[in-house]
């Protein structure tokens, strides 16, 4: 026996009701995500003096992100893809400072210096430690200069461009006769 009128209406009613209920229960793609920054940012980092300082990362789309360092604050809203960037005003050499980045969460970096940033690259000799040269009278004892920092980015192979790298903790280490 074929029922078309009443049972078809009931099926459509229950199907529509189920879709409406599920649409309110399922995630909509807007999953809360903490504010994050690339691995180059970390405690003890050095930021370039004498130029606008770029700070960037990821968060929820259209989330307000605020960056503060040494009494200077700048805010932005993330783009639709969740990326964000602010350019802090120029700063002179100095520190140590704290840098806070906040959105749905807060990240705090300590011992931040403003100064000269040098980028060095090379082959395997870039990993050679001066202390391995042996006894260099007077050289290593004078190497305790904690204002000088170094970050090492490990070699990684990828088939596609990357927007971050995996770093070891701590990222930035001060210059010392022990390293």
Regions found by a protein language model. Give the residues of each.
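Cell-envelope and extracellular/periplasmic
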Residues: 32-179
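Short linear, low-complexity motifs centered on an aromatic residue
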Residues: 1, 28-29
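N-terminal secretory signal peptides that target proteins for export/translocation
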Residues: 1-11
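Bacterial N-terminal signal peptides
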Residues: 13-27
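Charged, low-complexity surface segments at secondary-structure and domain boundaries
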Residues: 1-2, 18-21, 133-135
